[in-house]
């Protein structure tokens, strides 16, 4: 028996009782940073605002920040930003978001680039955007034939998410402009 055999396996019911910010990966709790850096939060807010402004006329989609996405009874993720469409009004997200944005920090980079990348791909999230605040750039991935296809690195360009219900877009120059020195 390995050490993992002795770790407790937690469920969504357990997760709901915990204080602080957590995610649940296949029954194992992952503590999230208690308070991200101001730059991280400001860029996340700017990304959410840009997405939200571009879908304002669409009544079927919403942009949310740090909302629980319950994938199963033992897996709950809390992406930085999601674009959801036709989601029932519930206490958590129940189906794959159209777009997920994760703003990288030193403590989450490996999880965001590996575990979450693979999970979002497997769960058929149409677009995954990984934002690098220190570099003021974002990588955009589009689901194609059940695999993520990198659309490019964006810093001063715009990207149209053509396969979303609300035809969302992000002007990365507008998002990053105020953070440039």
Predicted regions and their residues:
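Gly/Pro/Ser/Thr-rich low-complexity, intrinsically disordered segments predominantly at protein N-termini
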Residues: 1-181
């Amino acid at each position: 028996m390995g050490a993992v055999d002795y770790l407790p396996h937690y469920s969504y019911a357990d997760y709901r009782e915990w204080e602080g910010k957590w995610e649940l990966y296949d029954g194992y709790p992952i503590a999230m940073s208690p308070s991200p850096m101001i730059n991280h939060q400001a860029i996340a807010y700017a990304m959410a605002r840009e997405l939200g402004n571009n879908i304002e006329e669409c009544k079927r989609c919403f942009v949310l920040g740090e909302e629980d996405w319950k994938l199963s009874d033992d897996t709950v993720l809390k992406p930085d930003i999601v674009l959801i469409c036709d989601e029932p009004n519930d206490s958590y997200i129940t189906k794959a978001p159209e777009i997920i944005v994760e703003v990288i920090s030193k403590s989450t980079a490996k999880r965001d680039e590996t575990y979450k990348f693979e999970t979002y791909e497997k769960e058929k999230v149409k677009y995954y955007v990984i934002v690098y605040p220190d570099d003021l750039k974002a990588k955009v991935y589009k689901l194609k034939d059940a695999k993520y296809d990198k659309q490019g690195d964006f810093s001063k360009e715009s990207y149209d998410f053509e396969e979303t219900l609300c035809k969302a877009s992000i002007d990365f120059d507008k998002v990053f402009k105020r953070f440039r020195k």
